[in-house]
C-alpha cells in the first residue's frame, strides 16, 4: 500500500531528525547528503524503466546512489560517532559502499534464480516493471535478438515473457 509506505517513511525520517538534533554538524551534513543521493538514485531507477537501454556504468551509478550510499553512510557515521579519525571513517564508508552494491547485485540475482518461498516476496517483478538490473542489461547486451523475439511472440503475456526471459538468463553464462 503506497500511501501507508509513504507515511511510514515520513515517520521514520522524522524520528531520524529527532535523534540527529544533538549530533555534530558533520553527521547532519552527511545524513542530509545521503537523503539527496538516495532520492537521486531512486529517480534514476524510475527513469530507467522507461528507457529501452541503459549502460552498465549508469546502472552501477544508480545502485551506488539508491542502495550503497546509505550503507556507506551508516558505516561511516558509526565510525565518526565512535571517535575514529577521518581515514578510518573513510575506510568504513568504502566498506559499506561495497556491501551495499553487493546487496543490490545479490537481490537482482535472487529475483531471477530463487523461488518465491525463498525470497518471501513476488519474483520477477523486475522484469514486469522493466527494471534495468545487472542481469537484464547483460541479457540485452548478449541476447538482443532473443529478447526482442520473446517480447514479440508473447503478445504482452507477462507470465510467459517472465518465464522465457528468466530461462534465457539462467541458461546463459550471465549468472556465472
How should each PLM-predicted stretch be described?
Residues 1-176:
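All-alpha prenyltransferase/terpene-synthase fold signal
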